[in-house]
Amino acid sequence: MLRSTFLRSAAIAAISALAFSAGARAEEGKELHVLWSGGQYGDAVEKCINQPFTAATGIKVITESPGGLAKLQAMNEAGNITSTVFDLPTDELKRGTAQGLLEPMDWKAIDPEPMYDEAKDKYGIGTSYFSTIMAYRADAKAPKNWVEFFDTKNFPGKRALPDYPGYTLVFAALGDGVPVDKLFPLDLDRAFKTLNRIKADTIWWQAGAQSAQLLKDNEAQYAIAWSGRVVGKEGIVTSFQDGMLDLSWFGVAKGASAAEKAAAWKWLHWHTNAKNQACVATYISYTGPSPDLDPLLPKDKLKEYPTYSENKKVQWLANAQWWLDNADVVEKRWQEFKLQQ
């Protein structure tokens, strides 16, 4: 008992010391703490933005993975905000906003260079576009649209689908003939009807790399996949037509110090620079929010990028607000559907 009491006291003291240390550094304005997913995208940002940003401003960017809303919620509940910037998918940006966990963006302080309006949110800045698209083996019969993609009679083969309702139900609705401009509010009955029809030919994937691997190994002949995993891969054909365009966001934690917020606004400005975005895109085929990006990208790879003008115009934007408003209903029906598989 005495030992556990001592350990708890020591832990609390350590957390307090860390909080004081982080606060002191933040007040000096010499460090910016970022929680993000990291990976290949993180490596690219480190080379193209973080290192030159530090060289120019003297502000060191300290990153930690993984990021996400759960980390921000935990810090908020503990009353100890030790990181300032968090990377968030669109749905988590909306949830974090609804829960009051994010600071409003100071767009005057960020002073962004030209960027798409959809990437400017009151509580977040969209810095990286990605697409969810149709992919299939080069030796498979080519579908022209989502109705044909889900037609296993005339286009035989296994379908590799994301084991996530937000990335599957929308395309299943399109597969039942729902027009793109009538997609929301989503008709769940039509979406599940499509999935039930092809359940014998469905393989579910949970990690993005699985979609490409299933196609490569010929375990699946068709897939719904994230563009960065399949575009440009040997033996795989892709189409951005009626794909879902989405953004990854950075948000700033409510309760962060004034000094770290000031550093965050400076750092986020660098993400709006087209040349910096083009540099990132040379490492991973996800693009930033600049409308001036196309001329800066490698001409031989233009068709691989989500925001290439010819790709962007044939896609539709994810509707995170609908998913937030209907999360409980969707999750209940999704779990019921999966239990029947």
Located regions from the model:
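Periplasmic-binding protein-like
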Residues: 115, 129-132, 189-197, 234-256
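Early extracytoplasmic/lumenal segment of secretory-pathway proteins
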Residues: 27-96
